[in-house]
Amino acid sequence: MPARPIPELLAPAGTLEAVRAAVANGADAVYCGASRFNARDDGAQLTLDELEQACLIAHERGARIYLTLNILIKPAELPEALAYLGECIDRGIDAAIVQDVGLIRLIQRVYPTFEVHGSTQMTVHDVAGARVMARLGIDRVVLARENTLADIREIRAAVPDLGLETFIHGALCISYSGQCYMSGMISERSANRGSCAQSCRKDYVLRDATTGAELDRGYLISAKDLGAWEHLDAIAEAGVGCLKIEGRKKKPEFVATVTRGYRDFLAQVERGTFAPPTFEEVQPLVQIFSRGSTGGMYGGREGRSYITRTQPDNRGVELGVVTGFVDGEVLVEVHAPIAERDGLGFEPPAGGHLESTGFAAGAVRTLSERDGVWRQAIRARHRVPIGWRVVRSSQAALIERARASFADVGREARRRRQPLAVRAFGSAGAPLKAIVTAGDLEVTVRSEVPLAAATSRALDVAQLREQFGRLGETPFVLADLDAQGVASGLFLPVRELNRMRQAAVEELLVQRDWAREAAEATRGMLIDHAVAHVGEAAPAAPTVAADAATDRLRLVAEVWRIEDAEAAIAAGADEVVLDPFLRHPFPSVAAVQAMRERAAAAGVTVRLRTPTIVRPADRRKLDKWLALGTPVLSGHVGLVHELAAAGRDVVADYAANCFNAHTAAELFALGATGVTPSVELTTEELGEVVRPWGGTGFEVVVFGRPEGMTLEHCVLNAAFDRTPTHCRDLCTRAHPDTRLEDPAGYEFPVATDYACRNRLLHSRPIDGTEFLPRLAGAGIRRFRLLFNVPGDRVAEVTAAYREALDGVAAGGTPGRAVRALLGDRFTRGHFARAV
């Protein structure tokens, strides 16, 4: 039976040791970040010299190196990012994993043959998104961690030529990647900029905002670690071409252990003998690091069991219970034996409120073993209560085995050396001439003394090869020597041969430096040209252009209820964006249509806001609303392109992550009639984004609570341990207004949307009134207010912003009417706080 083709196994590395660990244990490719522009800004990075070594180590073993360039790039950073990528390409990387759409386009212009992969931060989770990736010309995309096997099969069938990659192991972001703004909101450490503060790993209280009642408490949005070993066969059959292990910040021992485990599982897939792994087979993968394991969402939502709940960090493996304490020894019953130097934790029974304890095991005695249960006595420094759970946080033997697996790998890897070719010519009485070439470089050197008749050893190929081959620590290695042009029976002192070699190397190095400087200058000019020429063919929105012609500052109010839409219209909004998907239940289509007609009579446009996440199963509900034929606002880049191609008026929302003008140009090229830049940009950065269009076609969010996270998981469902998506009475009747309260007392509203996803909103509304003059001065003419929480003062805030915009348009100031409404319960957002 022929072997089945299996996906590439992609391992993480944050250090050279981790690169060695990965390739030694069977990784087909390794992804790592260099010191700039990647999504791990706190230590999991290689220097450029280390990156070159990583490429050498990997390539010697037949593995590839992928560079993570997976953050959003600010306007001023684009030239630096492209130049830095060039330096990394020079070091030998095979591909780059990129998030920023504008950067992808620039890479294709500057490095047209280079391989580009789309990061999971691009939030590709359906056919429409995958089609845009194919249109962009990328080679592969990393799918959202939330995709099911059914989703993947549908994407594979619809876009057969796009490479697909998916995560199989490691830490899980609770939010859809690319859609987490919560860290940046709280601490200015943006997940989209590589500085995530891990807001999801904090403990929270879930409260009913109406009654104040506590509904749940703990690490409520801290996901367990992914371990998709049971699904490997099905993932491969679904058409995934690459399986990715998360963990660039993990230790080399983790990389070695997990890579080896999945390499062995994939060998079974290849042979056609795969069966779900046993406890013994997966135990090392869980033991090396685990917050608890989940199979992820390949089979659908898991509900309460998806979350760690009790602790956010490495827990290890639960082995058994404490049965006694005698003469300084803890007595335990465990289902796997404990050894000396193992790290142990002891936890109170479920529901207990005492703190856990732990220590490294001292002397261990096995008292008995029967039916897979070991009774052991462990020397301890203090008593541990009977009935407490025994957890092994680290296993000494496993760590030693992992270290041994890569101890000798890549230690001799040397810097890449360029092959030299030497052609020698000479006759009696004339100097020896050597033409030395290295790639496109060529030098000619001559001896300072003439060739003479040999009285002892004559000059021959072996001697020439020996002397010209002594290249030591130079960046060259002798590959070929041709001495056919040297007459026989001649002599030249060895010191003269050495001088010629040294002179050739010195001249080659000078030429190489000149060539490198010239290449860098050429590359720099190419980069400058590419960055300066922003998609000249990109169209601007005709409706927005018309607005600009009147010089009116247009006010857009985004709401989720019909009554709020009508309040905004009455208070002076020029356009209303309705998000009927934000919360259960939907408004009726007939009621929305009637409101739309009333708005039209008042000269107000009604625009439909789509969800950013539209899984295949959700599409039927969305299509019902799209049938209304309204203009659309969408943060789903795939939908922007699909609807624009069908002739719809579509504005790209902030979830499209427009961080620079080149991304804006690509969104316009996809058909967007307008673009809302990221809510993580400062006023000055927004000005840079909109400058090529003079502000025309752009809309800025100036008030309200942006969505901080989009979760496939539902915290309310988990609190009551209901079957996922079968509990709408909780969010529609029992607890329609809930908040997550963090340890500092900040409350984050939770909106449970049409597909039972949670959208976590910022704890306080942004107020950008003081920045209106500068934004208007940049040419921006559309300003959006977000009203997405019960109790929002829609009419008052809309009226205050109408007054502020009219004041700015008249050359005055925006006034303080909005601040008077808010008091001190607001934030200036990122208008003056860079991420």
Model-derived features: positions:
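Surface-exposed amphipathic alpha-helical tracts and adjacent flexible/coil segments at the periphery
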Residues: 1-24, 29-40, 55, 61-71, ...
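Short glycine-biased active-site loop of nucleotidyltransferases that positions the nucleotide triphosphate
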Residues: 108
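Active-site glycine-rich loop that binds ribose-phosphate moieties when present
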Residues: 124-126, 227-228
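Conserved phosphotransfer cores of two-component systems
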Residues: 111
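Glycine-rich, highly charged phosphate/nucleotide-binding loops
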Residues: 46-52
